[in-house]
Regions:
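Amphipathic alpha-helical interface segments
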Residues: 172-221
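Residue-level signal for threonine
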Residues: 31, 110, 133
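PLD-like (HKD) phosphodiesterase/transphosphatidyltransferase domain
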Residues: 52-130
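Basic, Lys/Arg-rich alpha-helical nucleic-acid-recognition elements, primarily the DNA-binding modules
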Residues: 1-44
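Short acidic/glycine-enriched loop/turn segments that link adjacent beta-strands
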Residues: 111, 162-165, 189
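Conserved segment of winged-helix/HTH DNA-binding domains
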Residues: 34-61
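Short beta-strand/turn micro-motifs composed of small residues
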Residues: 106, 132-134, 184
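HKD-type phospholipase D/PLD-like phosphodiesterase module
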Residues: 134-174
């Protein structure tokens, strides 16, 4: 190691004073607080890596605050690419396929999503609350009219004038877990999806969904 012993010693003393390490019979070891700090560091490092990985798409959003850092801590990132353009979109299909309840916000409508929702609602009575932009609802009512289930139990649809190119979804799974996810849209469809089951991510997305729902108007298809 090229670091001077005096530098190492000074660093250890500072960690001791902070209560992060203690001297034992076999040398220095992390305290309980030290273990927590290390865990937080690795979570932070993972979040930074995830943010940098999707920076190309985050930069397309009109507001940098639309997605908070907690969505990346412990999150799973899936990106579309030239060899698998539907890869990110398939993540959302998979989410809906194992859900017992879905709450979401979407600026767009995709055939794969519509078909999956229709199947789950008809077959399993999937509880669904969705907020669509006005343009997305028009697309749903015209291009995908054959998939629309009128007066379906447990399904509530809302309309809001405009939405950013960001889809949000809060999914309750059959195993009792709740998962938060977001997808970034471009003219070529969904480019990246991030999924996260952490309490902070779920709490943020629940609050965002409720905020959009309060601004929207419930409609009958």
């Amino acid at each position: 190691c090229d670091v001077a012993r005096s530098t190492v010693g000074r660093a250890i003393r500072e960690l001791e004073l902070a209560g992060l390490v203690h001297r034992g019979d076999e040398g220095f070891a992390l305290t309980v607080s030290g273990h927590h700090v290390v865990d937080q560091f690795y979570q932070f490092e993972h979040a930074v890596d995830a943010i940098c990985e999707v920076d190309e798409w985050l930069s397309t959003l009109p507001d940098p605050d639309l997605v908070p850092p907690q969505m990346f801590v412990g999150g799973e990132v899936t990106q579309a690419d030239i060899h698998a353009p539907d890869k990110a979109m398939q993540e959302t299909v998979d989410l809906v396929s194992t859900a017992t309840r879905v709450r979401g916000v979407s600026p767009a409508v995709h055939g794969a999503y519509v078909e999956t929702f229709q199947q789950r609602i008809q077959r399993d009575g999937l509880e669904t609350e969705l907020v669509f932009s006005a343009d997305a609802l028009t697309e749903l009512a015209t291009t995908y009219a054959e998939y629309v289930i009128e007066d379906a139990d447990g399904v509530t649809i809302y309309q809001i004038d405009e939405l950013p190119p960001l889809g949000l979804m809060l999914v309750d799974h059959q195993d009792g877990t709740t998962e938060a996810s977001f997808g970034i849209y471009t003219e070529n469809g969904v480019q990246v999806v991030v999924r996260n089951t952490s309490p902070n991510a779920v709490a943020w997305l629940r609050e965002e969904f409720e905020s959009y729902r309060e601004q929207a108007t419930e409609i009958q298809l």
